[in-house]
Structures are given as C-alpha cells and as structure tokens.
Swiss-Prot record:
This is Matrix protein 2. It comes from Influenza A virus (strain A/Chicken/Scotland/1959 H5N1). A lipid is attached at residue 50 (S-palmitoyl cysteine). It comes from the Viruses. The chain crosses the membrane at residues 23-43. It is a single-pass type III membrane protein.
Amino acid sequence: MSLLTEVETPTRNGWECRCSDSSDPLVIAASIIGILHLILWILDCLFFKCIYRRLKYGLKGGPSTEGVPESMREEYRQEQQNAVDVDDGHFVNIELE
C-alpha cells in the first residue's frame, strides 16, 4: 500500500495506522526529512530578511580593484558602506491585490 493512501482510522483502542511496517527505515528516514524540511521552511519564513541581506551584502565581494588608485578604492568603499547603511532595516513590502 502506498504511503499516500494510508489513513489513520479510529478503533476501539484509539487511533492506529493501518500501515503494518511503520518501523521500516525508509519510512523513518522520510519522516525525519519531512520534519527537517518543515523546520527549515519555518525558519526561512521568519528570518528571510536577515538571511538574504547577509547573503547580499556580507558574502559578496566587490569588483576587483587591481590597478585602481588608493583614493578611488577608498571612495568606492565609502559609497558601498553608505549604501549598506541607508538600506539597513528598510525593506519594501509589496502586496498583491
């Protein structure tokens, strides 16, 4: 019987699963993966602003500055820092009607 068609049915002793081999390692592994997926999905919904802002500004290296004078490098760094400071905490919420 497929896992998708198995149903818990009420009996005299309470709720029981009609699946006789629920101790199968494949069923246990699928359950663990499902639970982990649910946890990660919830965390993503709660913290997506923090996660994606870190990925956008924290891990991305800027363009190569090889051959560029130091004064221009410093000006570029300052512009990038100002862009991060201005954007910090300001997100646009788009609501679809």
